[in-house]
């Protein structure tokens, strides 16, 4: 599918974004192995989170969609830690790295063997990073060419480990913790830098014996999780596209409602403010241990900056759209320590650079980042998203500041995380 995006003079209005993808995955998995029903409000409408539900359904977990007080609900009928049953066929995680990596932690402890694979993008993404700690816990996992899906996971009795993550990764941390729920003894995960802690908060909310320290998580095995009512905040990573859209058009006054403001995720706001963005936080509340609030963004003068060190993994998903902002900022943008971008849905360093160049933007790539001079102007172009949802959406935002209409190839990739993206963009762009 190809989407035409026209230039815009302004971004105005009040809008919402889909339920947070990271939180949705975790709630679906944990509710499935909890005792009794969990009612989840605002579960993500994205294809990735649907993949998680499909996998859990294949493992014997029913879910029911509904509505309450005008809000979408999803009820997951949990069966407890021992309630999963062997799938009749290989599980399909679609495009979702979160699904395959985190669910593998649960599957490693089951009394049966499970195959799990994904689409043509996912089968190119490395899995050794989860296989190593799971093997230390006594799991046996076979991978294609030693590192890639499809995976064959032979369930086993697991033992707790003390594991230091070699690279900051919330997915790997979560995989080990989910396995740790079933393990004998204590499981400890140590991080080089703080990563998103949605798994830890959800585990605590559902009754796990978990201790959270700076960069260290301790989990006692054998916990009995209890189903409950859960609210998924709006996805800040999805909001990022509209925050940047407001910053690259001439006039802006935009409010994004009910956005997740978990401190492990708000580095994006710190980066934008550091570049000069005028962002206000409104009506902050707490739901299931997660902070939620409204964001207001208005016309701002954007200076530019550098993303490096511990900040990089904290904004790794937002770098495509931050690169777009960097090109029109006064001083440009430098991104370092972002080699993880090369093993996302595409090699995002190269895909970002390719499409910036298509729009006549000067950019230099490095092994672990990008160097983008500022004060540049976007030219109308045909954008190649390569089927990567964040590339499609980031360059749709760039198109708002172009000198003519842009065509976004494979624009339907946006449905992986934000099915309503283009309709929402049309509603707020003027």
Regions found by a protein language model. Give the residues of each.
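Structural preference for solvent-exposed beta-strand-turn elements
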Residues: 1-430
């Amino acid at each position: 599918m190809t989407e035409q995006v026209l230039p815009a003079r302004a971004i105005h209005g009040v809008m919402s974004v889909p339920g947070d993808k990271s939180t949705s995955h975790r709630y679906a998995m944990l509710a499935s192995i909890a005792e009794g029903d969990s009612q989840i409000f605002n579960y993500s409408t994205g294809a990735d989170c649907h993949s998680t539900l499909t996998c859990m359904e294949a493992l014997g977990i029913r879910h029911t969609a509904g509505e309450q007080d005008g809000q979408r609900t999803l009820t997951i009928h949990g069966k407890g830690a021992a309630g999963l049953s062997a799938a009749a066929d290989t599980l399909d995680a679609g495009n979702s790295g979160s699904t395959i990596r985190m669910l593998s932690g649960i599957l490693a402890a089951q009394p049966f063997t499970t195959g799990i694979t994904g689409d043509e993008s996912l089968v190119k993404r490395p899995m050794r990073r989860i296989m190593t700690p799971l093997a230390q816990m006594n799991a046996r996992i076979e991978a294609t060419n030693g590192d890639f899906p499809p995976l064959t996971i032979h369930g086993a009795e697991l033992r707790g480990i003390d594991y230091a993550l070699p690279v900051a990764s919330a997915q790997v941390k979560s995989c080990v913790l989910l396995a740790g729920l079933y393990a004998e003894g204590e499981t400890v995960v140590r991080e080089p830098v703080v990563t998103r802690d949605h798994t830890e908060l959800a585990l605590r909310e559902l009754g796990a014996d978990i201790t959270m320290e700076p960069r260290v998580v301790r989990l006692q095995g054998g916990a009995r999780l209890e189903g409950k009512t859960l609210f998924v905040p709006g996805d800040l990573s999805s909001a990022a596209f509209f925050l940047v859209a407001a910053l690259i058009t001439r006039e802006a006054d935009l409010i994004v409602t009910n956005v997740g403001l978990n401190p492990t995720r708000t580095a994006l706001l710190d980066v934008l403010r550091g570049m000069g963005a005028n962002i206000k936080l409104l009506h902050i509340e707490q739901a299931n241990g997660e902070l939620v609030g409204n964001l207001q963004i208005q016309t701002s003068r954007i200076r530019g900056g550098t993303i490096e060190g511990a900040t990089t993994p904290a904004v790794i998903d937002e770098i495509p759209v931050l690169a777009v902002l960097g090109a029109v900022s006064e001083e440009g943008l430098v991104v370092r320590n972002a080699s993880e971008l090369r093993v996302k849905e595409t090699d995002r360093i190269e895909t970002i650079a390719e499409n910036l160049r298509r729009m006549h933007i000067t950019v230099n790539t490095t092994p672990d980042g990008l160097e983008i001079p500022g004060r540049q102007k976007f030219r109308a172009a045909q954008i190649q998203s390569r089927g990567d949802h964040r590339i499609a959406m980031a360059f749709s935002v760039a198109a708002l500041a172009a000198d003519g209409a842009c065509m976004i190839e494979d624009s339907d990739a946006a449905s992986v995380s934000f099915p309503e993206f283009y309709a929402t963009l049309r509603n707020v762009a003027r």
